[in-house]
């Protein structure tokens, strides 16, 4: 994962075991450093993590973390509701599901199965330049809009 993609507060998953944090552990980013020569033996970007379940703090290379896929279940757990579902009816048509958060009535997420990604809409206008596939991507957009970007996994 690239350090440029991350911000403090993002949720990520560890993909390589170390002696403190196990593979698959969900963590919150609490610090970012472009390089750390002492601990990692090179010019590798380093991220400081706080484990969600045990509240351990650990720094590790960005190579050892990945984004957590944004799923419909995670949206539902965080107060988003299925607003509308559309099935593909013709060759030119696409399937999609629209989700909104009642507390934030001006935003919605549309899931496109063909892309396996979401797009964010503000007042019915698409505002996400790239498909949203990971929790941290949604967190960045919500934060930029001044909305609550805290997400439970």
Regions found by a protein language model. Give the residues of each.
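Amphipathic, interaction-prone secondary-structure segments
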Residues: 82-113
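Short beta-strand-centered aromatic/proline hotspots
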Residues: 11, 19-36
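Mixed-charge, Lys/Arg-rich low-complexity intrinsically disordered regions
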Residues: 1-6
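Hydrophobic beta-strand residues in large extracellular and virion-surface proteins
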Residues: 12, 27-29, 47-49, 65, ...
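Intrinsically disordered, low-complexity, charged/polar segments
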Residues: 53-84, 129-148, 153
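Intrinsically disordered, low-complexity regulatory segments enriched in Ser/Thr/Pro
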Residues: 105-133
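SH3/SH3-like beta-barrel fold
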Residues: 36-54
């Amino acid at each position: 994962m690239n350090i440029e993609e991350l911000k403090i507060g993002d949720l990520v998953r560890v993909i390589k075991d170390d002696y403190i944090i196990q593979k698959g552990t969900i963590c919150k980013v609490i610090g970012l450093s472009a390089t750390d020569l002492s601990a990692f033996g090179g010019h590798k970007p380093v991220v400081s993590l706080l484990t969600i379940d045990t509240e351990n703090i650990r720094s590790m290379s960005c190579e050892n973390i990945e984004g957590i896929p944004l799923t419909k279940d995670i949206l539902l757990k965080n107060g988003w509701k299925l607003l509308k579902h559309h099935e593909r009816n013709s060759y030119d048509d696409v399937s999609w599901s629209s989700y909104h958060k009642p507390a934030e009535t001006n935003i919605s997420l549309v899931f496109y199965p063909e892309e396996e990604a979401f797009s964010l809409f503000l007042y019915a206008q698409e505002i996400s330049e790239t498909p949203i596939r990971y929790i941290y991507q949604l967190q960045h957009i919500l934060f930029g809009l001044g909305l609550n970007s805290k997400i439970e996994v």
